[in-house]
Design a protein with these regions (language model features):
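Charged regulatory segments coupled to nucleotide-binding catalytic modules in large multidomain enzymes
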Residues: 1-12, 101-107, 122-123
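A metal-dependent hydrolase signature that marks the N-terminal structural subdomain at the beginning
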Residues: 1-65
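Hydrophobic, Leu/Ile/Phe/Ala-enriched alpha-helical segments that form helix-helix packing faces
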Residues: 40-52, 119-120, 137-145
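Catalytic zinc-binding patch centered on the HExxH motif and its immediate surroundings
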Residues: 54-93
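Post-HExxH zinc-binding segment in Zn-dependent metallohydrolases
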Residues: 70, 126-171
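Alpha-helical scaffolds flanking conserved acidic
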Residues: 108-112
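Active-site recognition of the HExxH zinc-binding catalytic motif
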Residues: 113-125
Length: 172
């Protein structure tokens, strides 16, 4: 299946790259992963609307094969940007014909929480556990909750699209 092929490729890439980050242009990602990511990005745009700097970094996110077990990282060269792990997104966004809404919830939660964590690093310029980072993450958490209420109808369209994609059937 496409999933096992991409998963094997991902594992090979992780071994090869070690700690280096190999980004993959979004248009080179396989379907339906690419269209699920497009929907996730739309949701992320709504939940970070009006947050100084954060929304810009959300719009500039890249996708990469990161070191195994790492789901997101902040890069500073050549420019500051957030990289999210293709493998982690695929693990979180699995087909589930029986419980597609639960699958979609897990997919969205994993994507948004990892993204907001990394964006908090970029915005604060601070490491895990520092007061600046905690303040930045707390601010993003507050915005994401209130924006979810504010933009509920808009966000729901993208959630429904993800649900239908995760309900299958998987492409061959």
């Amino acid at each position: 299946s496409w999933l096992s092929t991409v998963t094997k490729t991902s594992a090979r890439m992780s071994e090869k790259v070690g700690t280096a980050t190999v980004t993959v242009p979004k248009d080179k990602l396989p379907e339906p992963l690419r269209s699920i990511i497009n929907d996730l990005e739309e949701i992320a745009d709504y939940v970070t609307r009006g947050v100084p700097l954060a929304n810009d970094y959300v719009k500039g996110v890249v996708y990469a094969y990161l070191k195994q077990g790492v789901c997101g990282e902040t890069e500073h060269t050549p420019t500051t940007r957030v990289a999210l792990s293709i493998s982690c997104i695929m693990d979180a966004c699995k087909y589930n014909a029986i419980y597609p809404d639960t699958a979609a919830t897990n997919c969205i939660r994993e994507y948004i929480s990892t993204l907001l964590h990394e964006v908090a690093h970029v915005v604060s310029g601070a490491p895990d556990g520092s007061t600046l980072f905690e303040r930045s993450l707390t601010n993003l958490l507050g915005y994401s909750v209130t924006n979810t209420f504010t933009y509920y109808k808009e966000i729901k369209q993208y959630v429904d699209r993800i649900i239908s994609k995760l309900a299958g059937p998987p492409p061959q």
